[in-house]
Amino acid sequence: MFDKHTHTLIAQRLDQAEKQREQIRAISLDYPEITIEDAYAVQREWVRLKIAEGRTLKGHKIGLTSKAMQASSQISEPDYGALLDDMFFHDGSDIPTDRFIVPRIEVELAFVLAKPLRGPNCTLFDVYNATDYVIPALELIDARCHNIDPETQRPRKVFDTISDNAANAGVILGGRPIKPDELDLRWISALMYRNGVIEETGVAAGVLNHPANGVAWLANKLAPYDVQLEAGQIILGGSFTRPVPARKGDTFHVDYGNMGSISCRFV
Protein backbone atom coordinates (compact mmCIF):
# COMPACT_ATOMS: atom_id res chain seq x y z
CA MET A 1 0.00 0.00 0.00
CA PHE A 2 1.25 3.51 -0.81
CA ASP A 3 2.16 6.00 1.91
CA LYS A 4 -0.10 8.86 2.94
CA HIS A 5 1.94 11.41 0.98
CA THR A 6 1.26 9.51 -2.25
CA HIS A 7 -2.45 9.25 -1.43
CA THR A 8 -2.55 13.01 -0.86
CA LEU A 9 -0.73 13.77 -4.14
CA ILE A 10 -3.23 11.67 -6.09
CA ALA A 11 -6.18 13.28 -4.28
CA GLN A 12 -4.81 16.72 -5.17
CA ARG A 13 -4.57 15.74 -8.86
CA LEU A 14 -8.22 14.66 -8.87
CA ASP A 15 -9.25 17.81 -7.01
CA GLN A 16 -7.51 19.99 -9.60
CA ALA A 17 -9.08 18.03 -12.46
CA GLU A 18 -12.52 18.68 -10.99
CA LYS A 19 -11.85 22.39 -10.48
CA GLN A 20 -10.39 22.85 -13.96
CA ARG A 21 -13.17 20.76 -15.60
CA GLU A 22 -10.57 18.72 -17.46
CA GLN A 23 -10.11 14.96 -17.45
CA ILE A 24 -6.69 13.61 -16.54
CA ARG A 25 -4.74 10.44 -17.24
CA ALA A 26 -6.05 7.43 -15.27
CA ILE A 27 -4.38 7.13 -11.88
CA SER A 28 -3.75 3.41 -12.41
CA LEU A 29 -1.55 4.18 -15.45
CA ASP A 30 0.87 6.22 -13.36
CA TYR A 31 0.52 4.01 -10.27
CA PRO A 32 0.11 0.46 -11.65
CA GLU A 33 0.55 -1.13 -8.20
CA ILE A 34 -2.48 0.71 -6.80
CA THR A 35 -4.86 -1.46 -4.77
CA ILE A 36 -8.50 -1.12 -3.74
CA GLU A 37 -7.26 -0.09 -0.28
CA ASP A 38 -5.09 2.62 -1.84
CA ALA A 39 -8.04 3.86 -3.90
CA TYR A 40 -10.23 4.29 -0.81
CA ALA A 41 -7.34 5.98 1.01
CA VAL A 42 -7.09 8.46 -1.89
CA GLN A 43 -10.83 9.04 -1.67
CA ARG A 44 -10.58 9.74 2.08
CA GLU A 45 -7.78 12.25 1.41
CA TRP A 46 -9.95 13.91 -1.26
CA VAL A 47 -12.81 14.24 1.24
CA ARG A 48 -10.38 15.75 3.76
CA LEU A 49 -9.31 18.31 1.17
CA LYS A 50 -12.94 19.27 0.56
CA ILE A 51 -13.75 19.55 4.26
CA ALA A 52 -10.67 21.76 4.72
CA GLU A 53 -12.15 24.04 2.03
CA GLY A 54 -15.39 24.34 4.02
CA ARG A 55 -17.51 21.51 2.66
CA THR A 56 -19.47 19.23 5.02
CA LEU A 57 -20.18 15.52 4.74
CA LYS A 58 -23.91 14.94 4.20
CA GLY A 59 -23.95 11.22 3.46
CA HIS A 60 -22.65 8.46 1.22
CA LYS A 61 -23.33 6.81 -2.13
CA ILE A 62 -23.17 3.16 -3.12
CA GLY A 63 -22.22 2.22 -6.67
CA LEU A 64 -21.60 -0.81 -8.87
CA THR A 65 -24.53 -2.61 -7.26
CA SER A 66 -25.43 -4.82 -10.23
CA LYS A 67 -23.61 -8.05 -11.04
CA ALA A 68 -23.10 -6.86 -14.62
CA MET A 69 -21.36 -3.66 -13.49
CA GLN A 70 -19.22 -5.57 -10.98
CA ALA A 71 -18.16 -8.06 -13.64
CA SER A 72 -17.24 -5.28 -16.07
CA SER A 73 -15.16 -3.63 -13.31
CA GLN A 74 -13.59 -6.96 -12.28
CA ILE A 75 -14.72 -6.72 -8.67
CA SER A 76 -17.10 -8.82 -6.59
CA GLU A 77 -18.78 -6.14 -4.46
CA PRO A 78 -20.13 -2.57 -4.76
CA ASP A 79 -18.09 0.57 -4.18
CA TYR A 80 -18.89 3.73 -2.22
CA GLY A 81 -18.20 7.47 -2.12
CA ALA A 82 -18.99 10.62 -0.14
CA LEU A 83 -21.85 13.10 -0.55
CA LEU A 84 -20.92 16.70 0.25
CA ASP A 85 -23.20 19.66 0.94
CA ASP A 86 -22.54 21.43 -2.38
CA MET A 87 -23.59 18.39 -4.43
CA PHE A 88 -27.33 18.63 -3.74
CA PHE A 89 -29.97 20.06 -6.08
CA HIS A 90 -33.73 20.41 -5.60
CA ASP A 91 -36.40 18.94 -7.84
CA GLY A 92 -36.97 21.30 -10.77
CA SER A 93 -33.45 22.73 -10.63
CA ASP A 94 -31.56 24.25 -13.51
CA ILE A 95 -28.25 22.43 -13.31
CA PRO A 96 -25.15 24.22 -14.64
CA THR A 97 -23.69 21.80 -17.19
CA ASP A 98 -20.37 23.65 -17.24
CA ARG A 99 -19.79 22.70 -13.61
CA PHE A 100 -19.16 19.12 -14.77
CA ILE A 101 -17.03 17.31 -17.35
CA VAL A 102 -19.07 14.39 -18.72
CA PRO A 103 -22.22 14.35 -16.54
CA ARG A 104 -24.61 11.39 -16.57
CA ILE A 105 -27.81 10.66 -14.64
CA GLU A 106 -28.77 7.49 -12.74
CA VAL A 107 -32.06 6.54 -11.02
CA GLU A 108 -31.91 5.64 -7.33
CA LEU A 109 -33.60 5.68 -3.94
CA ALA A 110 -32.13 7.66 -1.04
CA PHE A 111 -32.39 6.52 2.58
CA VAL A 112 -32.49 9.33 5.15
CA LEU A 113 -31.42 8.00 8.53
CA ALA A 114 -33.13 8.76 11.83
CA LYS A 115 -30.62 6.70 13.85
CA PRO A 116 -26.96 5.79 13.44
CA LEU A 117 -26.10 2.53 11.67
CA ARG A 118 -22.93 0.70 12.60
CA GLY A 119 -21.48 -2.58 11.40
CA PRO A 120 -20.40 -5.28 11.51
CA ASN A 121 -23.43 -7.57 11.24
CA CYS A 122 -25.77 -4.81 10.05
CA THR A 123 -28.78 -6.30 8.24
CA LEU A 124 -31.61 -5.11 6.03
CA PHE A 125 -33.84 -5.07 9.13
CA ASP A 126 -31.42 -2.77 10.93
CA VAL A 127 -31.59 -0.43 7.93
CA TYR A 128 -35.39 -0.35 8.12
CA ASN A 129 -35.25 0.36 11.85
CA ALA A 130 -32.74 3.22 11.39
CA THR A 131 -34.38 4.86 8.36
CA ASP A 132 -36.58 7.94 8.80
CA TYR A 133 -37.81 7.93 5.21
CA VAL A 134 -36.98 6.85 1.67
CA ILE A 135 -37.13 9.38 -1.17
CA PRO A 136 -36.56 9.30 -4.95
CA ALA A 137 -33.11 10.50 -5.96
CA LEU A 138 -31.12 10.99 -9.13
CA GLU A 139 -27.38 10.65 -8.93
CA LEU A 140 -25.30 12.85 -11.17
CA ILE A 141 -22.08 11.01 -11.94
CA ASP A 142 -18.97 12.41 -13.57
CA ALA A 143 -15.42 11.25 -14.30
CA ARG A 144 -12.28 13.21 -13.64
CA CYS A 145 -10.16 10.48 -15.36
CA HIS A 146 -10.36 9.51 -19.03
CA ASN A 147 -12.55 6.48 -19.74
CA ILE A 148 -10.14 5.48 -22.52
CA ASP A 149 -6.62 6.84 -22.29
CA PRO A 150 -5.86 8.90 -25.43
CA GLU A 151 -2.27 7.63 -25.65
CA THR A 152 -2.45 3.96 -24.67
CA GLN A 153 -6.15 3.28 -25.45
CA ARG A 154 -6.34 1.48 -22.13
CA PRO A 155 -9.66 1.79 -20.27
CA ARG A 156 -9.75 3.16 -16.75
CA LYS A 157 -10.04 0.64 -13.94
CA VAL A 158 -12.09 0.39 -10.78
CA PHE A 159 -9.15 1.84 -8.79
CA ASP A 160 -9.53 5.04 -10.80
CA THR A 161 -13.27 5.24 -10.17
CA ILE A 162 -13.01 4.60 -6.43
CA SER A 163 -10.21 7.17 -6.07
CA ASP A 164 -12.46 9.61 -7.94
CA ASN A 165 -15.13 9.48 -5.19
CA ALA A 166 -16.82 6.54 -6.95
CA ALA A 167 -17.69 8.94 -9.81
CA ASN A 168 -20.15 10.96 -7.73
CA ALA A 169 -20.72 14.61 -8.60
CA GLY A 170 -24.29 15.53 -7.60
CA VAL A 171 -27.67 14.46 -6.23
CA ILE A 172 -31.18 15.63 -7.12
CA LEU A 173 -33.85 14.80 -4.52
CA GLY A 174 -37.59 14.96 -5.16
CA GLY A 175 -40.83 13.04 -5.35
CA ARG A 176 -42.73 11.77 -2.31
CA PRO A 177 -40.89 10.62 0.81
CA ILE A 178 -42.25 7.44 2.36
CA LYS A 179 -41.61 5.39 5.47
CA PRO A 180 -39.56 2.31 4.54
CA ASP A 181 -42.40 -0.09 5.37
CA GLU A 182 -45.06 1.91 3.51
CA LEU A 183 -44.33 0.16 0.19
CA ASP A 184 -42.43 -2.94 -0.88
CA LEU A 185 -39.22 -1.16 -1.83
CA ARG A 186 -38.17 -3.97 -4.16
CA TRP A 187 -41.03 -3.15 -6.54
CA ILE A 188 -40.52 0.61 -6.79
CA SER A 189 -39.96 1.30 -10.47
CA ALA A 190 -39.07 4.33 -12.54
CA LEU A 191 -39.27 5.65 -16.09
CA MET A 192 -36.49 8.03 -17.09
CA TYR A 193 -37.41 10.54 -19.81
CA ARG A 194 -34.81 12.68 -21.52
CA ASN A 195 -36.34 15.39 -23.68
CA GLY A 196 -39.69 13.58 -23.60
CA VAL A 197 -38.31 10.19 -24.70
CA ILE A 198 -38.01 7.20 -22.36
CA GLU A 199 -34.30 6.38 -22.20
CA GLU A 200 -34.23 3.96 -19.26
CA THR A 201 -36.59 1.97 -17.04
CA GLY A 202 -35.80 -0.01 -13.93
CA VAL A 203 -37.03 -1.63 -10.74
CA ALA A 204 -35.35 -1.17 -7.36
CA ALA A 205 -34.86 -4.91 -6.73
CA GLY A 206 -32.09 -4.68 -9.31
CA VAL A 207 -29.96 -3.17 -6.54
CA LEU A 208 -28.55 -6.19 -4.68
CA ASN A 209 -32.02 -7.85 -4.68
CA HIS A 210 -33.33 -5.12 -2.35
CA PRO A 211 -32.32 -1.42 -2.24
CA ALA A 212 -31.78 -1.52 1.54
CA ASN A 213 -29.15 -4.24 1.18
CA GLY A 214 -26.66 -1.72 -0.14
CA VAL A 215 -27.06 0.46 2.96
CA ALA A 216 -26.39 -2.54 5.21
CA TRP A 217 -23.37 -3.47 3.08
CA LEU A 218 -21.97 0.06 3.47
CA ALA A 219 -22.39 0.10 7.25
CA ASN A 220 -20.50 -3.20 7.44
CA LYS A 221 -17.82 -2.04 5.00
CA LEU A 222 -17.09 1.12 7.02
CA ALA A 223 -16.98 -0.64 10.40
CA PRO A 224 -13.25 -1.58 10.25
CA TYR A 225 -12.45 2.14 9.89
CA ASP A 226 -14.49 2.92 13.02
CA VAL A 227 -16.95 4.87 10.87
CA GLN A 228 -20.71 4.64 11.23
CA LEU A 229 -23.58 6.02 9.17
CA GLU A 230 -24.91 8.94 11.18
CA ALA A 231 -28.45 10.08 11.96
CA GLY A 232 -29.53 12.67 9.41
CA GLN A 233 -27.21 11.38 6.70
CA ILE A 234 -28.51 10.64 3.20
CA ILE A 235 -27.46 7.31 1.72
CA LEU A 236 -27.86 6.71 -2.02
CA GLY A 237 -28.70 3.03 -2.31
CA GLY A 238 -27.44 2.39 -5.85
CA SER A 239 -28.75 2.80 -9.37
CA PHE A 240 -31.36 0.56 -10.95
CA THR A 241 -30.85 1.97 -14.45
CA ARG A 242 -27.88 2.49 -16.71
CA PRO A 243 -26.45 6.03 -16.68
CA VAL A 244 -27.79 8.43 -19.33
CA PRO A 245 -25.58 11.27 -20.63
CA ALA A 246 -26.73 14.79 -19.72
CA ARG A 247 -25.97 17.53 -22.25
CA LYS A 248 -26.58 21.26 -22.13
CA GLY A 249 -30.24 21.83 -23.03
CA ASP A 250 -31.40 18.37 -21.91
CA THR A 251 -34.49 18.09 -19.72
CA PHE A 252 -34.92 15.02 -17.51
CA HIS A 253 -38.16 13.79 -15.98
CA VAL A 254 -38.13 10.59 -13.92
CA ASP A 255 -41.50 9.09 -12.99
CA TYR A 256 -41.47 6.91 -9.85
CA GLY A 257 -45.20 6.10 -9.94
CA ASN A 258 -46.68 6.29 -6.43
CA MET A 259 -43.52 7.99 -5.18
CA GLY A 260 -43.92 10.98 -7.48
CA SER A 261 -41.33 12.30 -9.89
CA ILE A 262 -38.14 14.34 -10.25
CA SER A 263 -37.38 16.84 -13.00
CA CYS A 264 -34.31 18.89 -13.83
CA ARG A 265 -32.82 20.80 -16.74
CA PHE A 266 -29.18 21.15 -17.78
CA VAL A 267 -28.37 24.73 -18.73
From Swiss-Prot:
Gene Ontology molecular function terms on file: 2-oxo-hept-3-ene-1,7-dioate hydratase activity; 2-oxopent-4-enoate hydratase activity; metal ion binding
UniProt cofactor(s): Mg(2+)
Catalytic activity annotation: (4Z)-2-oxohept-4-enedioate + H2O = (4S)-4-hydroxy-2-oxoheptanedioate
Keyword terms: Aromatic hydrocarbons catabolism, Lyase, Magnesium, Metal-binding
Catalytic activity, EC: 4.2.1.163
One of the GO biological process terms: catabolic process
Top EC category: lyase
Positions of Mg(2+) binding: 106, 108, 139
UniProt keyword annotation of Lyase present: yes
UniProt KW Lyase keyword: yes
Function: Transforms 2-oxo-hept-4-ene-1,7-dioate (OHED) into 4-hydroxy-2-oxoheptanedioate, a step in the 4-hydroxyphenylacetic acid (4-HPA) degradation pathway.
Subunit field text: Homodecamer.
Name the record gives this protein: 2-oxo-hept-4-ene-1,7-dioate hydratase
Protein species of origin: Escherichia coli
Underlying gene: hpcG
